[in-house]
From Swiss-Prot:
Protein name as it appears in the record: UvrABC system protein B
Domain comment as written in the entry: The beta-hairpin motif is involved in DNA binding.
InterPro entries noted in UniProt: Helicase/UvrB_N, Helicase_ATP-bd, Helicase_C-like, P-loop_NTPase, UVR_dom, UVR_dom_sf, UvrB, UvrB_inter
Stretch list, region Disordered: 1-23
Main location: cytoplasm
KW ATP-binding (keyword) present: yes
Family per record: Belongs to the UvrB family.
Species annotation: Streptococcus pyogenes serotype M12 (strain MGAS2096)
Positions that bind ATP: G44, A45, T46, G47, T48, G49, K50, T51
């Protein structure tokens, strides 16, 4: 029996107090949630402290909360901020645990089968288990997730029912406990004690839960009774303290008992027979042979080991679901009355909508050619309407909400005032004729004031030509193109802030992490060319890049005024008017945001130096030298992941793959 602690409130800790229009935004959001409003939008301008407002709302409504971001980097940033705001509550992180993932696929045109290949990040796997176990044990939980949270995860009921509950004085034999641990996919390993393992020393069993990374538990027996349970340091075995109740959740999210397993296998066999009959009737003998061989091997593994590679493809049978029925996901681990917050909703909701179709197209090919049973199609992400069915109450958070969010609710709460008093920038529209010389003059003014400039173009050629021109004119400039790796990108932004160069040119400067307070000018070339980067939403996002500096200014170079330009200019002017009135009424003098220029953490410096060296000469390395380089990078990748610098870890992974392909 799991004792769920449901009486612990969220406790927000911060040296800040709500300011600007944060108080009214917080009050409105809380009142609407408590009044039963299903959906609302927090329309927060760049730099207004949306995460702090979200934290205040969570602490006041006191509901388990799922925060969804559109990529791992943003999720990691939010996770770090929420951990600081709620040190006494359970703040969890749930993203895809793959450092590298090549999904199973088949290309009929070349008769190429691509086997699933992946590298699981142990640290993220631990955090995923920590998230699900926290949700089943307590209510004061915030889970920060990527869209990975809408993918199949296994039944929360089976996961909870399989948990092993232990207390001092409980009558249970040591061997019974060992059998129970094996049933929930723990492995016995008396030598290499790590997550998901247990070891036995006489009447003492030590267990390392899948949700922990440093602390394990020691269960001491006296005959067929538990004498004592202690929390211990996994490395030294040193006792930290005694515990009066220990719940051990399964070491995998896909778990089932023996009786249920046999029922599942019977269903798999029945589906196999049906599909084989179909293939044979169509004369697809190769596909039939392939499917029989693969599926019978998986069935044997399930019988003997309780697990097989690709077990998730049989999740419909394991969960007892009907064909087409949505899979269990992280959302099913939450209680009914939970709150969802969608960060950067204009991006995230588009991702949620698009996940299902791409997944189905790939899997249908595997089914058609005998690599998987049709039930594999039900191991999938949720459709958007299925996601909506899980929504009890939701807050969409964005500076530029999308059409979908606007169609879901008329309740829009604005957060326009920045705590620093900063205004949205002034905007000029200038003709494209003579734009190079005009822009050069503007850049020189900024250089004289030790300020920086962003320039955004629409094409790679324009960016390259402009970079060459400015260099000829003596401007210190860099072009950030799509081929630049994330690690280099971080270094480029840092160098821009330090004044190593003064102008950064790019095609898409909307990506996260491009907020630079030193930037006082944003120049938008071809502003009148309608499209993704020049629609109203894209323009407002780009304009926001100049909103961190008191002298922020935007120049749009265009030969005509498009509807998108006009709407973006009008919206910026409206916000600016509100901000000026507020500052005047409260005697606030705008100040440029003070943001430390952090030295890259030691691992980043080391890794970057290593990468630069290897990028210069790894082609001339011997195979042995390359192997040493790969080993060093793998270690650094793990260290980066442990520091939750998953962006850096991903770059390490990509370089490792490049090096491996050379041998």
């Amino acid at each position: 029996m799991i004792d769920k602690r449901d009486d612990k409130p969220f406790k927000l800790k911060s040296k800040y107090k709500p300011s600007g229009d944060q108080p009214q935004a917080i009050e409105s959001l809380v009142d609407n949630i408590e009044g039963g409003e299903k959906a609302q939008i927090l329309l927060g301008a760049t730099g207004t402290g949306k995460t702090y407002t979200m934290s205040q709302v969570i602490s006041k409504v006191n509901k388990p909360t799922l925060v969804i971001a559109h990529n791992k980097t943003l999720a990691g940033q939010l996770y770090g901020e929420f951990k600081e705001f709620f040190p006494d509550n359970a703040v969890e992180y749930f993203v895809s645990y793959y450092d590298y993932y090549q999904p199973e696929a088949y290309v009929p045109s070349s008769d190429t089968y691509i086997e699933k290949d992946s590298s699981v990040n142990d640290e993220i796997d631990k955090l995923r288990h920590s998230a699900t176990s926290s949700l089943l044990e307590r209510n004061d939980v915030i889970v920060v997730a990527s869209v990975s949270c809408i993918y199949g995860l296994g039944s929360p009921k089976e996961y909870a029912d399989s948990a092993v509950s232990l207390r001092p004085g409980q009558e249970i034999s040591r061997d019974t406990l060992l059998n129970q641990l094996v049933d929930i996919q723990f492995e016995r390993n008396d030598i290499d004690f790590q997550r998901g393992c247990f070891r036995v020393r006489g009447d003492v069993v030590e267990v390392f839960p899948a949700s922990r990374d440093e602390h394990a538990f020691r269960v001491e027996f006296f005959g067929d009774e538990i004498d004592r349970i202690c929390e211990i340091e996994s490395l030294t075995g040193k006792t930290i303290g005694e515990v009066d109740h220990l719940v051990l959740f399964p070491a995998t999210h896909f778990v089932t008992n023996d009786e249920h397993m046999e029922q599942s296998i019977a269903k798999i066999q029945a589906e196999l027979a049906e599909q084989l009959q179909l293939f044979e009737s169509e004369g697809k003998l190769l596909e039939a042979q392939r499917l029989r061989q693969r599926t019978e091997y998986d069935i044997e593994m399930l019988r003997e080991m309780g697990y097989t590679s690709g077990v998730e493809n049989y999740s419909r049978h394991m969960d007892g679901r009907s064909p087409g029925e949505p899979p269990y996901t992280l959302l099913d681990f939450f209680p009914e009355d939970f709150l969802i917050m969608i960060d950067e909703s204009h991006m995230t909701m588009g991702q949620i909508k698009g996940m299902y179709n791409g997944d189905q197209a790939r899997k249908q090919m595997l089914v058609d050619y005998g690599f998987r049973l049709p039930s594999a199609l039900d191991n999938r992400p949720l459709r958007r309407e299925e996601f909506e069915s899980h929504v009890h109450q939701i807050v969409y958070v964005s500076a530029t909400p999308g059409e979908y969010e606007m169609s879901q609710t008329n309740t829009i709460i604005e957060q326009i005032i920045r705590p620093t008093g900063l205004l949205d920038p002034e905007i000029d529209v200038r003709p494209s004729m003579g734009q190079m010389d005009d822009l050069l003059g503007e850049i020189n003014q900024r250089v004289a004031r030790d300020e920086r400039t962003f320039i955004t173009t629409l094409t790679k050629k324009m960016a390259e030509d402009l970079t060459d021109y400015l260099k000829e004119m003596g401007v210190k400039v860099k072009y950030m193109h799509s081929d630049i790796k994330t690690l280099e990108r971080t270094e480029i932004i840092r160098d821009l802030r330090l004044g190593v160069f003064d102008v950064l040119i790019g095609i898409n400067l909307l990506r996260e992490g491009i907020d630079v307070p030193e930037v006082s000018l944003v120049a938008i070339l071809d502003a009148d060319k309608e499209g993704f980067l020049r629609n109203e939403r894209g323009l407002i996002q780009t304009i926001g890049r100049a909103a961190r500096n008191v002298d922020g200014h935007v120049i749009m170079y265009a030969d005509k005024m498009t509807d998108s330009m006009q709407r973006a200019i009008d919206e910026t002017a409206r916000r600016r008017e509100i901000q000026i009135a507020y500052n005047k009424a409260h005697g606030i003098v705008p100040q440029t945001i003070k943001k430390d220029i952090r030295g890259l953490i030691s691992i980043s410096k080391t890794s970057h130096n290593d990468i630069s060296k290897e990028e210069m000469d790894y082609e001339s390395m011997s195979r042995g030298e390359r192997k040493e380089a790969i080993n060093a990078l793998q270690k650094q990748m793990q260290e980066a992941a442990e520091l939750l610098d998953f962006e850096l870890a991903a770059q390490m992974r990509d370089l490792i793959l490049e090096l491996k392909l050379m041998d």
